[in-house]
Amino acid sequence: GLGLALALPHRRVVVHDGDGSLWMNLGSLATIGLHQPKNLIHICWDNRCYESSGGNPTASATERLDFAGVARAAGIESAWCVLTIDDLVDRMRHALANPGPHFIWASVEPGRTIALSRPYDELENKYHFVRHVEQTEGITILRQPLGHSQERAGH
């Protein structure tokens, strides 16, 4: 999300993150705090477990840890914890109306009500997303690979 926000400063970038993912990369908050992208909204959906890998508890299951406090300490002044839908709506309205970066820590209940069945191919998802950005921004991110004859000629 940060790279996209920095590369496309005229676009609003909203990152949806899970608590497990964020716990494994807390340094991302410090990097966001350092670069201060005005167009970035980072939402952490905290269900207090690694749901995708079996439901083991994350560090936030202790209720002593505060993602919003960590974000503020990392330099993201606009950082909040939301516990209700109304709080989430209010904070999103604020974030959309004001320069960021913004961090929203949303406490949610673990468990899925519907099992999603969809093919998941990380490489295909990457290319699909990049092609969408190329089309909507009118830019080239990925170039076509050079043919063998061009590579040998030093082009």
Where are these regions (language model features)?
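SAM-dependent methyltransferases
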Residues: 119-155
